[in-house]
């Protein structure tokens, strides 16, 4: 991580803006009493100074989970206060232009109430067991024997500094109730090492599927050692699709399930890592339909070139915290849902089951994606 003067200057500017605007709208402008103004100013100053240190201690070499929890939570809180303070500041200026003065205090109250309400709702949505989002997907090359195959997708669990072992057990119970034929985890399993997150991941060993349980790496596995997570998921009984494929069969008909590494794998510096669609599909019968697990939606270009029938991705969290989706869309055109690409390929992007960093989901609900694969013959009957 850079530590030069330019980096320090940019960091100070970002922290000043992120904390300064909410301070201006909520504390300085409304004309509160001296005591309220002093206390409010002290809170924002302490947070602006303490936040980067907590972030470095939590996510740096110390990997101190308590510091990470505090820093991540504050990042989400101050982001929402910043966003709504921008809107509140604009509202105040518009009202002033129309001759309405003295709006700063009611605007501050509205900004505070809306922000705190959304944060409370967002925390509940982030920590809940993800609800099922069900969808039928017609695959033109799928044969009738595999019609009705239930593919349950769990993505972006991000087991991390907040111990969610109980959430993990309840989520596996929800998966069990969905009766998957194929259970797919499409990466970003955890933030941290296997030793740190073993308890949270353990319930996945009992998650059932009648045909296959398959897993691929996301970009976050490469922050803590992808090889260790690959070995651990293999030990839990999952098929790790590390640039490889398996064949599942039902009713005399077959489906290829392939997986490739995340886009960041090749640049991670970790031996043997890097997306390789040719290796993943080596020896595949070209007449068979292909389901590909690839963590990032923009890997769909690879899927189209390889003639994949359906790519399953995660990574985006649907934006996780409004309006962060606008920034995510700069990198990933497809944030969630089903889309078509080229003559054959379809892409489904899951909003994910968990959260990264701030424990909030605002206007981007979590989900267990339940895709019922349909053959055209059965779908048309």
What residue spans do the PLM features occupy?
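Hydrophobic alpha-helical transmembrane segments in integral membrane proteins
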Residues: 105-112, 116-141, 160-166, 224
